[in-house]
Regions:
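Outer-membrane beta-barrel transmembrane domain signature
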Residues: 73-75, 119-205
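Bacterial Sec-dependent N-terminal signal peptides
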Residues: 1-34, 224, 228-229
Length: 229
């Protein structure tokens, strides 16, 4: 009886080890499909003013360039769906007929109607951005060229504007909103991707031009963004 008991115990032990090995194998096998798409990115966009401002004209090229890094957090076993959070830098500039002027340490804004002057009035500013996004891609562990759709929002810390007016010296504008947000959609194949972004806040703090029209400067951005592993 003792021998039979030992044989039975050994069988149970072998069976337990067998099933344990199957579980461990399946876990290792599932882990083999798990990967991250941590990426550096670089992009450039063209600005289109979204708010209607009387007599406002956008002249020349207005846009930005951006660069940064996205940390990938897969949310399914095949890693085709993920969340992303990143850190980036943006340099923005736009040319228009908005003319800031300084008098007694106060800044005033007006619309310049002269065709000659308006094309020379460039305003620029920089931002630190925190993109948070949902990421879908048609990729595998060994496939590096695939379709992707990344959509989310950005929180931006903005730094003072600088204006190169049509006449006079450069002006430092402190009226910029310190924090703004935007929503975006990036989609494409492999390295090349279309980038769409829409500002949810105006850039300037509750400013008006000389005729008391609200100076709500916000943009729709259309451009390209490139991802690198």
């Amino acid at each position: 009886m003792e021998i039979i008991h030992k044989i039975s115990t050994n069988k149970r032990l072998v069976t337990f080890i067998y099933f344990l090995s199957l579980v461990l194998y399946s876990q290792d096998n599932s882990k083999s499909d798990f990967y991250r798409e941590d990426q550096f990115y670089f992009g450039s966009s063209y600005f289109i003013q979204t708010e209607s401002i009387e007599n406002f004209k956008q002249n020349g090229f207005s846009g930005n360039f951006q660069l940064g890094f996205i940390r990938d957090i897969p949310i399914n076993s095949s890693s085709t769906n993920a969340l992303g959070i990143g850190f980036g830098f943006e340099r923005n500039y736009f040319t228009s007929n908005i003319q800031p002027t300084e008098k007694d340490n106060n800044l005033n804004y007006e619309i310049i109607v002269s065709r000659f002057l308006e094309s020379k009035n460039k305003i620029s500013f920089s931002s630190i951005s925190i993109p948070i996004e949902y990421r879908w891609r048609k990729s595998t562990l060994s496939e590096y060229k695939f379709w992707r759709i990344y959509s989310g929002f950005k929180i931006k810390k903005n730094f003072p504007l600088y204006s190169n007016p049509s006449y006079g010296s450069e002006l430092r504008i402190k009226d910029i909103e310190d924090w703004t947000t935007s929503i975006y959609l990036n989609a494409g194949y492999n390295t090349w991707n279309i980038s769409l972004e829409y500002d949810l806040n105006p850039i300037l703090k509750n400013k008006k031009i000389s005729n008391q029209t609200d100076l709500n400067i916000s943009f729709f951005r259309l451009g390209l963004i490139f991802y690198f592993l």
